[in-house]
Amino acid sequence: MKKKLKIGMIIAYVVLILYAVVSLFPFLWSAIVSLTPMRYTENCVTTGTDIMKWPPEINLFKWPPEFFGAPATGENYVQVFKITPYARWILNTIIYAALVTIGHLIFDALGGYAFARLRFPLRDLWFALFLATLMIPGHVTLIPNYNLMVRFGFVNTYYGLFLPKLTGVFGIFLMRQFFMGIPREMEEAARIDGASIIKTYFKVVLPISKPAISALAIYIFVGTWNDFLWPLLMTSRKEMFTLTVGLDFYRTSYYTYWQYMMAASIMMTIPMIIIFLIFQRQFIDTGVSSGVKG
């Protein structure tokens, strides 16, 4: 029995290691390409999947990779800031992600508390219908939302980016589940002491809900930081691009500046890695606990 268990553990570890290698290889490839001097691939032209290359340049897409022989340089990272308004794109992305996250924390918590504690006609039916909207693909609402933003004149503005994203069904569901797990006696004690429902919400419920709020904030911020489709629709001026949209700036009809694109991608990814490493415990613990309560 112990021998079978040991073999099973070995197989499991091998599978996990292989999965980790496969998952990390694209990031490793991006990091190496971002450090490869531009002169080593400046004659490498990409058109779709076809690659035309003149020696002695390095082919970034050859297997096994041959770019390990190129001397590493940080020049590509410097050039990203010189040839594009990358600093402005960082600012745009931070503003976009921060405003959307703040909106979700406010409205999702209020909506979740309403469904968890307030009594109103057909509350459970409304909540079921509300959850049913999760089955509607997000792409279905893209055109209506875009038309509304165009009518309001919010294209190429921060308003157009964050207003349609200020709340979401998943966030309300997450907060509602967490609120359902809070003992009612705590709120009733506050009400007996003379606290209004609003004061009870802010002084009792929200402080207890910091783990769920933290998890929701991380989830929304990371998702918004990596959002591509909506910023692509709402921004046409280079100065209003977010980081995800700006990556396409390094590609033309005949040439892709892979070193610059990968350098920009690495700089875009690093903040998210740091956030996950710092808050991974709260994120995982809260994701498990709040998802099963109520």
Stretch-by-stretch model annotation:
Residues 2-4, 8-294:
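A structural signal for multi-pass alpha-helical bundles of membrane permease subunits
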